[in-house]
């Protein structure tokens, strides 16, 4: 006899823990992070009347494809009343940041143009791995700091990029602290020298800039590690490699101070298909394999599983399909049987 699995949906989670200010979906690419993000955003805006912002931090994912409207690089776009979508153009944001750095160098040193060597070095930083992460979490922190929405839903990059993005915040924070410490000592010497000369020390624009960077980093790290404000969900499918990847990712995220709120098991074939006449042997084997791994997920992760979402007969894109996905994600439909 098949038995019900105890994944009651995000509605139950929100009733028990309250609706957070921020929801983050993470996981390996192609498993349903973006679909989960878009479906939850649609549900919370339309059915729960929450002012909701859905933000993609994954350059490979596409909220534009799922919502069937172009958001890329267009800033904050209102899709529906109470539902806004942002898909950042990280390359353009990095280019804008580089332009700001050049402008500040010219202002600080009274230059008409940035010296050629420095200009080339700044341009070369766009190839640095940290630049994308920096641009992305900078955008995330700015959006949350503005406090324009009840709920922020972030679609994180795949595991490797997601972990690196979070780790980079800690690395940059330490780097900024070291530079600030050194710069503060220089500023103290400059102040003493100015006092001896009877002149007034000029404002240290470098320290001011470093302080701004540190503030943004702190906003980001505080945001994703605060369990009162943020719910962190991981999406996986019932396959061996997905389970192993999830284990590794959970370990890495724990080391970075991020606590899992729950798991969403996605793309699960309805077990009722086993009773369908004419079912192919291939499909039967796939369903049986999935049932095995669904059991393993529940045994291994226990009550961490908060929702089970089935495999749908067509691609989950467009508002009608997102509403269907949301019914399972929120737990409004019957749970998966194994």
Q: What do these predicted regions represent?
A:
Residues 134, 214, 291:
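Electropositive phosphate-/nucleotide-binding environments in soluble metabolic enzymes
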Residues 1-17, 70, 220-338:
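C-terminal lobe/tail of nucleotide-utilizing enzymes
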Residues 2-23, 28-31, 36-211:
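Nucleotide-state-sensitive switch-loop elements of NTP-binding domains
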Residues 204-220, 242:
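C-terminal-of-GTPase-core extension/linker across diverse P-loop GTPases
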